[in-house]
Amino acid sequence: MAVEIEVETPLQDDVQGLIAELNKALLELTPPEFCFHMTAEQMAAADTTVFIARDGGAAVACGALRRHEDGVGEVKRMYTRPSHRGRRIGAAIVDRIETLARQQGMTRLVLETGDRHPAAWTVYERAGFTRCGPVLDYPDSAWSVFYEKTLTA
């Protein structure tokens, strides 16, 4: 069965479980003060669109687009369960995020990820993101790696 990616509410029990796994995974690699989590409730806000990948109905991956001022979109909450890694599900979610950002007139995507997440770097770099300095209101930290991508028409 093919993995399907759709916009969904993060307030569903199984999606909240996926978010809890994401938070746990981040805290295993990064000090809490440098983990910039969003709760499921924050992810359900009007400024954020959440994409959920499902395999046979089970939530297996997520990612979100958070809208900021001046045409900037932020890639947030990217996670794929270990059982589904290596299948380019994360890349497909990033593609969906970028497509939505373009449709909504955004001109730039940015993101913050951890310094111990080389698999994530690969996903972003393959999607055309380049490393940059700190973005939005994130602190400049050795624990963070920042990326950006200019969106052209």
What do these predicted ranges mean?
Residues 2-3, 10-11, 107-110, 114-128, ...:
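C-terminal "cap" of GNAT-fold acetyltransferases
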